[in-house]
C-alpha cells in the first residue's frame, strides 16, 4: 500500500491573526480518484520535526506540493528541504509539484529565475502545450511565476518535458523523484496522461 505524505502551504485566514497550514480540496479529490486503495496525510510546517512526523505515520511517498514561491515562507522552506533530504537519503520516492519542483532544482544547486511579463502571459493561470522527449504534445495547466532553464539544470535531473513556446523545463526525473511544473490535482485537457506519468513512476520505483 502507498502511504502518501503531502506538504502544505502557509496561509492566513480572513479575520484571524494566526497562520494556517492548508491544502486545496483538489488534492483530496485527486487521491480518492487516482489512488482509492491507498492512504494519504498532510504534513504540517514544523521544520525539521516534520521528518519525525513523516516517520511516525510510516509514510512511504513524499509529495512536495505547489503554491507560492520559495523564500516567501521560511518555515515551509525549512520543512520541505528537511523532508526532501530525508527522502533522498532513504530512497523514498518523491513527487515534486510546481513550487516543489523548483525546490528540488534549488536543492541540487540550480537557480530559480523570476519570469517576466512575457513569461507570465504564457504560464500564469493558463493552459499551454508541452513537448516530451518522445516528441509527443500534451496540454497542461500552468500557474507559476518562476522558471527553470535547461542550461542551469543539474546533470542528475533528466528533462522529460519542455514548454513548446519558450522551451523552459516543465518536467524532470531521476532515479528517486519526478518533478512536474503543472498541477496534476487540477483540471486540464490531458489529465489522464499526467496521472499515468505519476503512476508509472511509482510502479517502476517499487518494481
Go through the PLM ranges and name each one.
Residues 1-99, 106-107, 113, 118-126, ...:
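N-terminal beta1-alpha1 cap of cysteine-dependent amidohydrolase-like domains
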Residues 102, 110, 146, 178:
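Glycine-centered loop/turn positions within well-structured domains
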Residues 139-140, 178-183:
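Active-site-proximal beta-strand elements of phosphoester/diester hydrolases
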Residues 143, 153-155, 175-176:
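Short, proline-enriched alpha-helix->beta-strand connector loops that line the catalytic pocket
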Residues 143-150, 169:
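The feature captures the conserved acid-bearing segment of alpha/beta-hydrolase catalytic domains
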Residues 166-174, 178:
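Short, surface-exposed beta-strand/loop micro-motifs that present aromatic residues
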